[in-house]
């Protein structure tokens, strides 16, 4: 009964969370937020309570507090203080309120150290909350969470939430973005706190406003204020609290809301040990061991949160069990309510649960072995924290540290080495071992293999966020026992193992095993490895090993982790080949290059495995398919992981970005292992999960922007002396980047032939893609400009067959133009390219991009090869001449084609001269004939203009043609045009006067003054002189006066007796 009563107290603590320590006075201006009720939400208090739940360190930086969450979790901002909103929890709340511990023993010290009225920095009000960003992309709107909390969840079970807990209790909340009590709240409300560092509220801490990384830089102590240092004690009781959690490097969305769980990813050295009294510790252990139904308390996230933030353990459920079903619940040891599986990322089999979902086997085994394991810890006085920074090797839990997995299962796996494959071998595959989907990647990029929990082959895979995965000591020992029997490389025996104890880390060495016992399984093939081939590494450096069959990518890269026939525990070995260390080559640089692979080699990793098991790897929305679903409901990676528009799915053997490049499973994981450790590291130079491309940069290093790390560093000016040879494997990617394309263009101009050939080899396979790329097309053009003849012809052959689509494409048309300029027209490939336009001439001519290609063809190709263009223009000259793009092509024909070809074009032009001169585009064609045409063609046009000079000169477009007529006509024709203007009358005034005032015709008059013979110029002057005073009133008339002044000031004798005006003024 004592345990039951305590379980109720642990489960429901909404009011007790705040009532003992909440301040009810308000020193600030009460009218700041308007008139509100007496008892308001916690946004109304000047600062939060002294409770540890509101401590600045209990809540991650840049995480918004849930607006309006007051004394109980789902209250509105102006709600009156009242018992629980649901009647079901009223009695619990009353008991909790009565039995809540008095804070009197802590208030004094807080008042002594607190500085009331001055701590604005600690305020978590809406002003502060609005300025914070969201730590997770999955964080939902705060107000929407408040409004939908009761409506959406109250129908799942009797208590209102799928977890069997009140909506008021925020310790276990599957809604991202909501506030969750930190483990320190659990401790403080359970009873007296033995650690004075826990439970302290806003204090005048000099480090309070610094980043959390600085605050917890010391793993032993927590800087509370300037007066005292409080040390952290290790656990003192028989509870399996000696787990080593790993910090997640990204914003994690797991089973719990991590907004206020500081252990997971906000600290460099997470304070994972929450201090409890000895009595409470013993009660936890006894409750877990003796009463299975108390596991519901642990599943609610209360007790385990005080010890382990959120690791994952392998459940004992049968293969393919869906945790949403009753079978999954039974396997997870009678959780309190259905187990909620949150939105997750990476492929993990069903049955891998957070460690907080306690299991009976783990509880019993942990209770029995905790005291025995305590003596073997590497550092007894300090909880070890695994957080691999940049350049560090990934740490793993040591052999002495035990987890909350089901040790009994691991022992069973050790006793029966073929447990992991038992069902698979029994279902029609005797003697052919296929790895069940028990491997996945954790947040460090390491390959994690389930300890025999997934015994079937067809178990569905779920998506999991990059959160820690724990390894139990029993699993390690079981694997060691299995390896001792010669069945597989063990966790302790193999120096290349994925998981090895922290305390025992021998130097990296090649481990040879008898070939008779080394029956190895890779993810994509099964092969019997000999002594010359120790194991199939996940991404092997060397060429293909004898006897290995790689089903994924060719050229001998055995793309599978060499998992032994007995997968008991974590008996896996990812080692490099002993026979190929001297012949190391660039990873995936030849046959599996980005654009060289055929469609067959582009099969997604793991696709043969899933398809053979009736589980399709085709893309589908992110979800968690049930075991009963048919193929086609596979899992897909987050969209950001596909940078080349690929539709490849997320697969077991490795993450791909859609183009065959391997990427780490965890966001940010590539930064941790850039500089790899040389001892016992998966990411070392001799045994690497992701081998580097050029000593440092992995093809797996895909930044969040979708660019590789090399390109990202180059864009950030981290490589001022980058050379073309440094871009091997990245030429295409750089060509498609604005800055990278410019860099390659500049280098190609001064590159050696060998360097140009290296670049050319990479871009040739992606030539068409680069031709249509906004930046890549310039690299192709550079090769047409600076490449050798063979390179130019090779690129031209890539254009063949695609001339029309390229000609109509914005960037492809530029490539074709450059090719036509750079390659001699007598080359056969050029003639073939031009011939592809036959039948599509008019379409190209009227296209904004294609017309440039046709123009370039006319300019660069021999006219005899262009007769099909002339034939296409027959009967279309007037239409094309009045077209914005067609008029340009007509002009090119008039310039470059033979007389025989241009004659029919000119005949059609002369038939429509009067319309063309007044057209906004056709007038350019007529002007072009006047400038470059034959004299007879010019005379025809001038004869069309004569008699209409006055009218056409006042036209916006025709006035330009009249000017050209005056300029390019013969002397006799020009005299006739000028006489027409001078002698013609327009009403009471001469035509000259009208033209001088017109906005367009005045330019014709100016041109006549310039081009006229001296005798005619004198006549024009006499005609203009009477109108000088009037012309001053008109804007355009002033242009004529300026022209007259020019000639008068010359005092030219050509003016005769005219001289200046009598008054000396113009």
UniProtKB/Swiss-Prot annotation:
Tissue expression summary: Expressed in male germ cells of adult testis (at protein level). Highly expressed in testis and ovary. Predominantly expressed in stem cells and germ cells. Expressed at lower level in brain, heart, kidney, liver, muscle, placenta, intestine and stomach Expressed in cerebellum, corpus callosum, caudate nucleus, hippocampus, medulla oblongata and putamen. Expressed in all fetal tissues tested.
Region Guanine-nucleotide binding in RNA target, annotated ranges: 959-963
Conditions for induction: Down-regulated in keratinocytes upon UVB irradiation.
Repeat region (Pumilio), residues: 726-761, 762-797, 798-835, 836-871, 872-907, 908-943, 944-979, 983-1022
Region (Uracil-nucleotide binding in RNA target) residue spans: 777-781, 923-927, 1002-1006
InterPro entries: ARM-like, ARM-type_fold, PUM-HD, Pumilio_RNA-bd, Pumilio_RNA-bd_rpt
Protein name per UniProt: Pumilio homolog 2
Species annotation: Homo sapiens
Gene name of the encoded protein: PUM2
């Amino acid at each position: 009964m004592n345990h039951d009563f305590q379980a109720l107290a642990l489960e429901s603590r909404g009011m007790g969370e705040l009532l003992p320590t909440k301040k009810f006075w308000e020193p600030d201006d009460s009218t700041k937020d308007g008139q509100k009720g007496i008892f308001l939400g916690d946004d109304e208090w000047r600062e939060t309570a002294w409770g540890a739940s509101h401590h600045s360190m209990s809540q991650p930086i840049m995480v918004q507090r849930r607006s309006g969450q007051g004394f109980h979790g789902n209250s509105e901002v102006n709600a009156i203080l009242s018992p629980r909103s649901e009647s079901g929890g009223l009695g619990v709340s009353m008991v909790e309120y009565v039995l809540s511990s008095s804070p009197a023993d802590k208030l004094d010290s807080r008042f002594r150290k607190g500085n009331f009225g001055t701590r604005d920095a600690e305020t978590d009000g809406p002003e502060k909350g609005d300025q914070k960003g969201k730590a997770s992309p999955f964080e939902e709107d705060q107000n929407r969470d408040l409004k939908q909390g009761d409506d959406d969840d109250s129908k799942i079970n009797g208590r209102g939430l799928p977890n069997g807990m009140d909506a008021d209790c925020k310790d276990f909340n599957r809604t991202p973005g909501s506030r969750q009590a930190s483990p320190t709240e659990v401790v403080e409300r359970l009873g007296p706190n033995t650690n004075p560092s826990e439970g302290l509220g806003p204090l005048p801490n000099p480090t309070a406003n610094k980043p959390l990384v600085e605050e917890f830089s010391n793993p032993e102590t927590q800087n509370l204020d300037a007066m005292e240092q409080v040390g952290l004690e290790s656990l003192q009781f028989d509870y399996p609290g000696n787990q080593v959690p790993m910090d997640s490097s990204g914003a994690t969305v797991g089973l719990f809301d991590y907004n206020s769980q500081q252990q997971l990813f906000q600290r460099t050295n997470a304070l994972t040990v929450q201090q409890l009294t000895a009595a409470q510790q013993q009660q936890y252990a006894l409750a877990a061991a003796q009463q299975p139904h108390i596991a519901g308390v642990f599943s609610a996230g209360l007790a385990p949160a005080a010890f382990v933030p959120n690791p994952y353990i392998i459940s004992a459920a049968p293969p393919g069990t869906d945790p949403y079903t009753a079978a999954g619940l039974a396997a997870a040891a009678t959780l309190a309510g259905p187990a909620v599986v949150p939105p997750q990322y990476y492929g993990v089999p069903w049955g891998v649960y957070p460690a907080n979902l306690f299991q009976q086997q783990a509880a019993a085994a942990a209770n029995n072995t905790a005291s025995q394991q305590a003596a073997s810890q590497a550092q007894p006085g300090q909880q070890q924290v695994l957080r691999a920074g940049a350049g560090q090797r990934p740490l793993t839990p040591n052999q002495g540290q035990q987890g909350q997995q089901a040790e009994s299962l691991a022992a069973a796996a050790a006793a029966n080495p073929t447990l992991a494959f038992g069902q698979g071998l029994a279902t029609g595959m005797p003697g052919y071992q296929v790895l069940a989907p028990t491997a996945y990647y954790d947040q460090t990029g390491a390959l994690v293999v389930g300890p025999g929990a997934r015994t079937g082959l067809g178990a569905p895979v779920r998506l999991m966020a990059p959160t820690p995965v724990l390894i139990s000591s029993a699993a390690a020992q079981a694997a060691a026992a299995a390896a001792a029997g010669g069945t597989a490389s063990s966790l302790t025996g193999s120096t290349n193992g994925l998981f090895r104890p922290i305390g025992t880390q021998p130097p990296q060495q090649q481990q040879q095993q008898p070939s008779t016992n080394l029956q190895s399984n890779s993810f994509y093939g099964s092969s019997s490895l000999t002594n010359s081939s120790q194991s199939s590494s996940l991404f092997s450096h060397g060429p293909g090993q004898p006897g290995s069959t790689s089903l994924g990518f060719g050229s001998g890269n055995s793309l599978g982790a060499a998992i032994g026939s007995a997968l008991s525990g974590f008996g896996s070995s990812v080692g490099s080949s002993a026979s190929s260390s001297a012949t190391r080559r660039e990873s995936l640089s030849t046959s599996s290059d980005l654009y060289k692979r055929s469609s067959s080699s582009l099969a997604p990793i793991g696709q043969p495995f899933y398809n053979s098991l009736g589980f399709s790897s085709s893309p589908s929305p992110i979800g968690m398919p049930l075991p009963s679903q048919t193929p086609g409901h596979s899992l897909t990676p987050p969209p950001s992981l596909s940078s080349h528009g690929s539709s490849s799915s997320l697969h077991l053997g490795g993450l791909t970005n859609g183009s065959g490049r391997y990427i780490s499973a965890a966001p940010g994981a590539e930064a941790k292992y850039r500089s790899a450790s040389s001892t016992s590291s998966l990411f070392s130079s001799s045994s690497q999960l992701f081998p580097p491309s050029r000593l440092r940069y992995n093809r797996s290093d895909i930044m969040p922007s979708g660019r590789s790390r090399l390109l990202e560093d180059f864009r950030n000016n981290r490589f001022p002396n980058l050379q073309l040879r440094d871009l091997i494997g990245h030429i295409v990617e750089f060509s498609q980047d604005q800055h990278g394309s410019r860099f390659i263009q500049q280098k190609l101009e001064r590159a050696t032939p060998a360097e140009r050939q290296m670049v050319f080899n990479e871009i040739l396979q992606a030539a068409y893609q680069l031709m249509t790329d906004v930046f890549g097309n310039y690299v192709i053009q550079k090769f047409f400009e600076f490449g050798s003849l063979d390179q130019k012809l090779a690129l031209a052959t890539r254009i063949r067959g695609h001339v029309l689509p390229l000609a109509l494409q914005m960037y492809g048309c530029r490539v074709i133009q450059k090719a036509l300029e750079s390659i001699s027209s007598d080359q056969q490939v050029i003639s073939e390219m031009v011939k592809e336009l036959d039948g599509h001439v008019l379409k190209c001519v009227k296209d904004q991009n294609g017309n440039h290609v046709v123009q370039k063809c006319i300019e660069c190709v021999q006219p005899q090869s262009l007769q099909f263009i002339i034939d296409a223009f027959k009967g279309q000259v007037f239409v094309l001449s009045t077209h914005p793009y067609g008029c340009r092509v007509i002009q090119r024909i008039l310039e470059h084609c033979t007389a025989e070809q241009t004659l029919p074009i000119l005949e059609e032009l002369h038939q429509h001269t009067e319309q063309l001169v007044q057209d906004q585009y056709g007038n350019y064609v007529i002007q072009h004939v006047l400038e470059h045409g034959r004299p007879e063609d010019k005379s025809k046009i001038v004869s069309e203009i004569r008699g209409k000079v006055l009218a056409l000169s006042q036209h916006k477009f025709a006035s330009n043609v009249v000017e050209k007529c005056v300029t390019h006509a013969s002397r006799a024709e020009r005299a006739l045009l000028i006489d027409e203007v001078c002698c013609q009358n327009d009403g009471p005034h001469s035509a000259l006067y009208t033209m001088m005032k017109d906005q367009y015709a005045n330019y014709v008059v100016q041109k006549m003054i310039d081009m006229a013979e001296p005798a005619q110029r004198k006549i024009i002057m006499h005609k203009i002189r009477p109108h000088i005073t009037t012309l001053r009133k008109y804007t355009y008339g002033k242009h004529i006066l300026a022209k007259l002044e020019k000639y008068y000031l010359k005092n030219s004798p050509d003016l005769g007796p005219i001289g200046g005006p009598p008054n000396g003024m113009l």
